[in-house]
Every structure is written in C-alpha cells, then in structure tokens.
C-alpha cells in the first residue's frame, strides 16, 4: 500500500532499469509475489536458458500465469520496475484506491470494494464486467496505436480524448527471425495505465513456446550481441498529482553480448501522460542470424 503517488514514485525510482537481481532483492522485502516474478520464465541467464532448452514448453512461472490468467510477459508493454511493485493479481493500492492492471484494461475501485472487483474480474485476461458496475472504473490499456473502439462507454479514456485498443506487445515492434522458432524483437512504446505511464526502448531475444492451446514467444538468453540506438522527443502532461519525471529530447545507444534483453526507460511518471515520438534501430548478431530493423512509437 502507498499513501500517495509521490510515495510510489520514490519506491519506483531506484527500480527503473535495475538488474533482475536488484529487483528480486527489493521483492524479497515485500510480503507478496510480484507480477514480474509471477510471469518470469527464468531464462534470462545462460544456465536458465540451457535448463529449458530441451522443451518448447513454459519454464519458470510461465505455466502458472498462462494456465490461471492466460497472460505472458509480452502482454505488459512496460519495463520490469512497475511489475515488481504490482502483486500477482496486477493490483496496487494508492490511498483508498486499488488499481488492477490486466492485459486489456486498468480497473480502479475503493479499497472496500476490492472483493467485488476480484469476483467480477478474476484473472489478468478477464473481460470487464458486463453489468457496468458503477463501483468499478474501467479504462482500456492505452498504447501508441489508436484504433476505433466498439467497447462499451464505460470503457473510456478522458472525455474528448482518443480511444485505444490494447495491442499485445507494444506500440511499435519489428522482428528479425532466425528460423521459425527464434527471433530478435525490437520495441518502442508509450503506455498509459491511469496511475502510471512509461516510454522506452527494448531489444530482446525470443524463442517460440507452446502450452496447452497457447503458442507464444518468450524472452530467453542468447550468446550473441543485442544492440539498439534511439532518438526521442518526449514531453509529459500533468493530469494528477504534482511532480515531474525525466522527459525531453534524448538520444543514445546500447550494446551487450551474452544477454536476453536490453532496455532503456526514456520517461515515466505517476498520474502523468507522455507525448512525443521515439525512433529506434535494433540489431542482433549471433550464430543464428545477423540483422536489424527499426521502430517508431
């Protein structure tokens, strides 16, 4: 529980782009399993990837998240920092309001109505309540891809604002394939969750997996080099609590050999929106493939 958005921001700040080991250390201080850990496939290291390489099935906690909630890590287009604060139900409490982030929507209820929300939205892939319960505020996950929406009126953004559909993954993606079961994915994204907003760039190595009726791509270690370069011009508009977080013109590049994923958070905020563009170039070079692609969000 956080007493205010500023308290949440202070807790998040040291987690932004922190290592998996650092995030795990923070999570050990919490009395609940984080959403990050709940969906973790455990293949971010060479040893973890080797342990799971003999099967195309889920590894780590992926099977639980898929079977119970029908989601994978790719359904949440943000960095690991905010996922390390949410519990495994996707919930977080700020003051008297509990927010629940699912694959497609963000819900807000008074803490006294949390049991109602859990009953009507039992999983991380459940649709919004069909009865339009006034105790539950529903807003669709916003990405950078605007589309016409046919969802009920109670699934709405701010009055007069654009309507969005959730796009699994991110606002803009590109892929370089190595056969049918391995690929590099490059991502640029801006994501808005009512109480949290984030923009960033990610390059990761993925392998295709199957579980029951799901076929999905999951992050895994590879011995080659992943890299990206980016330019961005981002601004933030305050819509709630005071405070400001990094935004503005930025450019940079990053390269790492022997990893599963590289990521940069370009801007983030609590009760803020992010505007502007991100242009990024993603590359991979390993024993399977050498190639590059571009994204804009």
Segments (PLM) and residue ranges:
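Mature secreted bioactive peptide module from preproproteins
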Residues: 141-297
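N-terminal propeptides/leader regions of secreted preproproteins
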Residues: 1-168
């Amino acid at each position: 529980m956080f007493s205010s958005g500023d308290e949440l921001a202070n807790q998040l700040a040291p987690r932004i782009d922190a290592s998996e080991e650092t995030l795990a250390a923070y999570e050990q201080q919490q009395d609940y399993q984080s959403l990050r850990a709940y969906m973790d496939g455990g293949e971010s290291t060479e040893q973890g990837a080797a342990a799971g390489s003999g099967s195309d099935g889920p590894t780590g906690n992926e099977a639980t998240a898929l079977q119970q909630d029908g989601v994978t890590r790719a359904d949440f287009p943000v960095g690991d920092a905010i996922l390390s604060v949410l519990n495994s139900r996707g919930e977080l409490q700020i003051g008297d309001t509990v927010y629940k982030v699912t694959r497609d929507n963000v819900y807000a209820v008074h803490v006294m109505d949390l049991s109602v929300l859990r009953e009507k939205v039992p999983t991380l892939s459940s649709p919004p309540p069909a009865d339009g319960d006034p105790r539950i505020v529903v807003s669709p996950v916003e990405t950078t891809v605007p589309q016409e929406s046919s969802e009920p009126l109670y699934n709405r953004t701010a009055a007069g604002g654009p309507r969005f559909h959730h796009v699994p993954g991110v606002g803009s993606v590109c892929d370089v394939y190595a056969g049918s079961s391995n690929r590099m994915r490059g991502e640029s994204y801006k994501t808005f969750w009512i109480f949290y907003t984030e923009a960033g760039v990610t390059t990761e190595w993925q392998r295709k997996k199957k579980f029951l009726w799901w076929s999905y791509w999951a992050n895994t270690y590879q011995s080659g080099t992943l890299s990206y370069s980016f330019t961005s011009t981002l601004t933030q508009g305050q819509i709630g609590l005071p405070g400001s977080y990094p935004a503005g013109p930025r450019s940079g590049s990053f390269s790492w050999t022997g990893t599963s994923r590289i990521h940069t958070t370009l801007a983030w905020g609590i009760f803020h929106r992010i505007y502007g563009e991100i242009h990024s170039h993603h590359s991979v070079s390993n024993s399977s493939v050498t190639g590059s692609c571009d994204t804009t969000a």
